[in-house]
Structure formats: structure tokens, C-alpha cells
Amino acid sequence: MASYDFIQTDSELASLVALLRRRERIAVDLEGENNLHSYGIRVCLIQLFDGHRGYIVDPLAIRTKDLLKELFEGSGWLKVMFDSTNDLLALRHELGIKPSSLYDLAIAAQLLHRPGGLHALRDGPHSARAKDRFQKSNWLRRPLPEAMLDYAISDVLDLLDLADALAADLAKEGLTAEFDRRNRERLDKVRVWDPLGNFTRIPGFQRMRRAGRERAKTLWYAREYYARLHDLAPENVASKPQLAKIVELGLRDGEAIARLLNESRQRNRVDPRDFGRLLADAERDAERNTETLARRGG
């Protein structure tokens, strides 16, 4: 395990930004929260490795968020990442950051027909078992156990070596230009988090009649509003199968819906008054968004 510095203050981060300006490329990874333990998308840790030493930045402890922006946008070094899609979305959504450069190893692996994720490219011990151990960890908790910090930094330690190996294979196969094109396309893509747009994931949605679909959409909105108000993961308010059940039973008011959701539930019990109030807001907003799409021809 390489040595690493844990960056938790603005002054430490400012010094790191100045230091990394002298580097040509840095391996980067994020640990985040995505509607698993609380509401929304959060950047919880930023892991960096310059080929010699590792750095873990705690963005929750940084007061001057512009320093985080400077780290990713004001630096000239190449950001070497693996499967950056979710990380780029999190940076953009929470911090308003769009990295100035990118080298995504997942694109290279795809072009070279090497499936299986990052652990499949590795020969070391940091494989799927280690990933599974921390897959659902709460990265918002503080202080973080040393084992979680060690795991976090381990995810970037071999990215630069992998980048060299994959770049050589791309060149050998004549795929460098195609990699550059796809890599630039991923970096330039506009990313917007739209939690209200996923109501079609409710089981059986496509088989519902029009009234059922409209009700499912309203319930999805209400679930999002309640989760945001109480800082809960939406699935801890109502699972997607529960939403489908509510539609099937024709439940219309907050009291009846909360009663169903709270069956056999000790934690995260749904407040019927809050849900009923938000359900009214959801009905209005869902109808308004449907009308807007209709006017646009969507």
C-alpha cells in the first residue's frame, strides 16, 4: 500500500493544487453517495495518485469549494480514470465541475474487447471481493475507518500503469484515434441529474393504462419530494414494487398510502400528513410537466 496524505483543510488542498500543477497526469477516482443512505448525489472522497504518492481529499471538509473546482478545471494534468460517467455526473451536479481533461480507461478496455470492469484488468489483490465489501458503504460517515480509506486509495494506485499498457495496445491495434474521439465525446457530454424522469422504472409501467401511468408518475414525484424533504434514500420511502402496488390498489390519499408503506416498518416510517401534502404538489407538477412535453411534441 502506497503512502497517502489525507487532505481535510483548505490550506492543505491549496498546497496540493500547487504541487500537482507540476505533474503531467494523475490517477483519479471518487467515492460518493447516490441515493443509497441519504437523498441525492454527493461527492464524498476524491482519491489521487501521481505515480509516487497518494492523496485523499475530503470534499465535505473543504469550505472553499472553488479550490475543488481549481483542482479539476484549473490544472493542466491529465485525469486518468476508469469508467468516469458517474463520477463526472457527480462532479457536475453537486460541485459544478467539468474536468479540463480526461483519459478514461474503460473506453480503452471496451475498444480492446476486455469486459469485466476494472478488477478484470488487474492482477493484484484489489479485486471484486474488496469492491463488494465496500459497495454499499456509507461514504458520508465521519470519521471514516482506516480500512475504508485504505480501500479508497487502492483504487487509483495502478491506474497509471494500466493506462500505459492500454495505450500501447491501442496503438498496436490502430485504435488510438478512435479512443481519442470517444474519450473527448465522454468529456464533452452534458450531464444532468433528473430523478423525476425515471418513473418508467416502476414495475409494470408499460402495461398500465393511461390513468395508471399518470398515477405512477405522480407517486414517483411524491416519493422524490418526500425523500428530499427528509434526506432519505427514495427506496427507503417506497420501493418501486410498492409504488406499483399503490397504483394497483388505487390508493389516493396520504393516510392510506402511508399505512401501506409503514406495514412491518420500524425505521423510516412515512408521515401521512407530509406525504399527503407532497402528493398534492406532485399531482400538480406531474400534470404540468406532461403538458409541457406535449407542447414540445415530446
PLM region descriptions:
Residues 1-44, 48-298:
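DEDD superfamily 3′-5′ metal-dependent exonuclease/proofreading module
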